[in-house]
Amino acid sequence: MAAEIILINPPPLNWREKHDALNHPHLGLAYLSAYLRQNNFECQPIDAKFERMNLEELGKAIKKYRPILVGITAMTHEIGQAAQVARLVKELFPEVKTVLGGAHATALPQETLRQFPEFDMAIVGEGEITLLELVKTLIQRGELSKIAGLAFRPSSDAIILNNCRQPIQNLDSLPFPAWNLFPPSQTYSLITTRGCPFRCKFCMRVSGNQPRKRSYQNVLEEFKMDINKYGAGQILVEDESFGLDRKQAYPFLDALADSGLNKKVKWVTQTRVDLVDEEFFQKLKAAGCAWVGFGVESGNEKILKEIGKGITLKKVEESISLAKKTGLQTGSYFIIGHPYETKQTAWDTINFAAKLNTTTVAFGIMVPYPGTEIYSMALRGEGGYRIISSDWADFNKTIGASLELETLSRKELEKLQLLAYFVFYFKNWRFWDFFKLLL
């Protein structure tokens, strides 16, 4: 089969990750595939995680094609799986080039190429234009050194990082995600903006600090496509902070309500507590939004200030109360293991989360993701941190074990995480919700 480029989301690492894997195809691969096809290159994405493939099954899928380039995306904890995929590609097609993209490659491009010789190149930041230029350069046998946003290995003992690539400004110029190249799904994701202006110490910002927005008309057309062409039953609006620009969000929400699409699909999103008010929630509700999530992170004011979150507990309570009043389901996200965290501050978080009693909740253990200020602090031993693993697979907030604090051992952090769920559900008499969590 003809496919000049194959783009891969690696298989799940283990049964737990297979169970927890997302129930919708990868948005980044869909954007990249659409962009390459718009520019007349045959591209085939393989979302091994979404399809719950193992490595052997992925190998059979890859062998159907004759690529000149294989791209692999990976978060930090997935980098080992991505390297396994790259090794598999080299076994099947020794002459084919492999390129890594995603958060880990963006944060540590040179270090990653040094650690994993299976990758020939790494893309730093947004991938559409860089990947297209890479494909053209490989076909024309041009110079890789001229491609902004690329790291590559010109020889076995050298690694070059080219100049940075500026973020795409006109997001409306990008084609809609190529969902037709993936197996059918009931759920699809989209974004209305790229980039985040906030500077939380724990967060990776692959798309940079400069917010760039799509026109509301462009987003509305994608909504229509997902529903009418692909039969979406649920849409995830995956902006880091939906509603960052009211001048964009309000016309979109009004148009969505007027279009009747709000009655055809359930959609969810996430935002910040300091970006919302009652009018905002009313427009969300009228536009068909069913659930809105908030990154609360901590139930302690000093910790919130330490991590640069820029919110207060009072504002958290006010915003979530307003969302509930409007009839929206709510979600809250918390982290245990902030800089200088103690057992008392962790319990402040647990009790505050229970008090909020959102529809859903998630408690993660802090991970020092490369590219974040937390990572730099942990490397320097600041914040009371100790990195206790050099295995990137442990850099997973749900099931990993990458760091501990002088005041809280890894076992204590894990115990607090479990207790957080127990207290949240049992204190609110939500016993069945707790047991569903264990299934």
Region spans (language model):
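Hydrophobic/aromatic residues located in beta-strands of well-ordered beta-sheets
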Residues: I5, T98, I147-A148, I235, ...
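Proline-aspartate-enriched helix->loop->beta-strand connector
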Residues: R66-V70, A232, T358
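Glycine- and acidic-residue-enriched helix-capping/strand-helix junction motifs
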Residues: R16-L29
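Catalytic cores of alpha/beta
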Residues: P109-Q115, F280, Y340-K355
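N-terminal [4Fe-4S]-dependent radical SAM core
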Residues: I5-I6, P11-K18, L144-I147, A151-T192
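Glycine-rich beta-alpha loop elements in corrinoid/cobalamin-binding modules
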Residues: E4, Y35-C164, I168, I365-V367, ...
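Radical SAM [4Fe-4S] cluster-binding motif and immediate context
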Residues: H24, D172-Y333, N351
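C-terminal accessory regions of radical SAM enzymes
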Residues: A2-W15, A151, Q329, W347, ...
